[in-house]
Swiss-Prot record:
Family: Belongs to the cyclophilin-type PPIase family. PPIase D subfamily.
Gene name in the database record: CPR6
Higher taxonomy: Eukaryota, Fungi, Dikarya, Ascomycota, Saccharomycotina
Record has Heme as a keyword: no
EC number: 5.2.1.8
GO molecular function: cyclosporin A binding; peptidyl-prolyl cis-trans isomerase activity; ribosome binding; unfolded protein binding
Name recorded for this polypeptide: Peptidyl-prolyl cis-trans isomerase D
Extent of the TPR repeats: 217-250, 268-301, 306-339
Domain PPIase cyclophilin-type: 7-175
Length: 369
């Protein structure tokens, strides 16, 4: 199958995330592939219709649904109407070329449309097989590099209309040489991590072998710990989050008591470490979420429970909900009455409550004076 390689350089809120490389099925759907290729290179210049560059550059992924797809390619509509625009290199719309290829696996490129023969520039990347789209949307390529970036996008926080809260942007795009060799799946990202973003995307992990899964999670967790010790907090949090996602996606049956104990221990360690790093990064909501996950682990011991409660309470201080922080830190103090860090956190929560109430009293007094 003839396949032109093209790429997106993806950023999230201005922070580079990496490169996603696609191969286009030129010989199966040449017209559709040529449209996407030109919108990557921008070689058609300015649209006489919209006055916008015929290019994906600086456009965002406006609709993302976990376990389904990531959609983008609308570079003509205003920000509050994304998903209603887009334009092909042939004019506004063009016909469905053919439906020879099916949506039978994740990481396929397919045309978004509003009905038969309404293809423009909008596209989507599948993240699971989507056979219900066969015969309705034209498959024209697939991801051959950067699958982990697609997975991060897929799992990003969403707001209204399934739009990512943060702007996942195509910061740059273009065409690669015909003989381009994609970076091998699971290539080291510079930290020693050679695993895909999602557990089931790995060819090197036997999902039916608990020891294989535990070894991968432990390796990712250890990389997170090393990065934490080096002061690389963002990268450390990224690795703990990745380890957590592996555990959240793992639903084994019939584990031995020993394997169950290992699973629970890994969950506790990863969740608690994620909460710790989130606090260091001043990410209160993330710290609370990670601590809550730790508290839900079966057979949690008192020492771990105390840590989780403390980190949850400090997370609430960061989000300025000191009343909730006080309640949780008091619960932690009951488990460990002599813990200086908990005592200090509780004092901070009470002090902040007093400051806010004093400020409110002054404001009310001024209002009625």
């Amino acid at each position: 199958m003839t396949a032109t390689p093209v790429y997106f350089d993806i950023s999230c809120n201005g922070k580079p995330k990496g490169r996603v490389v696609f191969k286009l099925y030129d010989d199966v759907v040449p017209k559709t592939a040529a449209n996407f290729r030109s919108l990557c290179t921008g070689d058609k210049g300015i649209s006489p219709k919209s006055g916008k560059p015929l290019s994906y550059k600086d456009s965002i992924f406006h609709r993302v649904i976990k376990d389904f797809m990531c959609q983008g390619g609308d570079f003509t509509a205003p920000s509050d109407h994304l998903g209603t625009g887009g334009e092909s290199i042939y004019g506004e719309k063009f016909e469905d070329e053919n439906f020879k290829l099916n949506h039978n696996k994740p990481f396929l490129l397919s045309m978004a449309n509003s009905g038969p023969n309404t293809n423009g520039s909008q596209f989507f990347i599948t993240t699971v097989p989507t056979p219900h789209l066969d015969g309705k949307h034209v498959v024209f390529g697939e991801v051959i590099e950067g699958k982990s970036i697609v997975r991060q996008l897929e799992r990003s926080e969403k707001g209204a209309n399934d739009r990512p809260v943060e702007d996942w942007k195509i910061a740059d795009c273009g065409e690669l040489p015909a003989n381009y060799e994609p970076v091998a799946s699971g290539a080291d990202d510079g930290t020693g991590d050679t695993y895909e973003e999602i557990l089931t995307d790995n060819d090197t992990i036997d999902i039916n072998n608990p020891q294989s899964v535990f070894a991968a999670v432990s390796k990712i967790k250890d990389i997170g710990t090393k990065l934490l010790k080096e002061g690389k907090l963002e990268k450390s949090y990224e690795k703990y989050t990745k380890a957590n996602s592996y555990l959240n996606d793992y639903f084994p049956e019939g584990l031995s008591p020993e394997d169950l104990s290992t699973l629970h221990g890994l969950k506790l360690s990863c969740y608690l470490n994620a909460a710790l790093v989130a606090l260091k990064l001043k990410h209160g909501k993330d710290a609370i979420a990670a601590a809550n996950n730790a508290l839900e682990v079966e057979q949690i011991d008192d020492k771990s429970k105390t840590k989780a409660l403390y980190r949850k309470g400090m997370g609430y201080i960061l989000v300025k909900d000191e009343e909730q922080a006080q309640k949780i830190l008091e619960e932690a103090l009951e488990l460990e009455p002599n813990d200086a860090a908990i005592q200090k956190g509780l004092q901070e929560a009470k002090h902040n409550i007093k400051l806010r109430r004093d400020k409110q009293k002054k404001a009310m007094a001024k209002f009625f004076s």
